Amino acid sequence: MSTPKPDARTRLLDAGMQLLRERGYDATRVEDLCTAAGVTKGAFFHHFASKADYGVAAAQHWTDTTAPMFAAADYHAAPTPLARIFAYLDLRRAMIAGAPAQFSCVAGMMAQEVFETQPAISDACGASIAGHAATLEADFAAAIAEHGLGDVVHAADLALH
């Protein structure tokens, strides 16, 4: 039995995960996305009012597709908060192999490119990044408390950076 093909919107968003990392937001044309997704330009505009709307959706799609991988990652099994933080950093280090387009963060890349020109995309990327950082805050807070550093650093700040 064959696996059902994702709908056109999902195929467009999936195509963007690679194209946006290879070319950047500005250099990725609607036509390129359509070709990669195997859909027409009309299908693109059926699902997205503009390329900017696509950019906002792409940031959310990045979150939706990467969050389960991070949630299931082995670093959560480390025995202490500090060990989990170091295991997370080890995971991130292991992820940065090969060409940048293979491992770079779509939200981070787009945020850097469009922060002055596309506020809606910039905000969506910021929400994606902050949302991921929030998943690390509890371990940072516990490690800070465990090591008596509460007056020196803040969990949310460390998680975001």
Task: Please describe what each predicted stretch is.
Residues M1-D7, I144-H147:
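N-terminal intrinsically disordered/low-complexity leader segments
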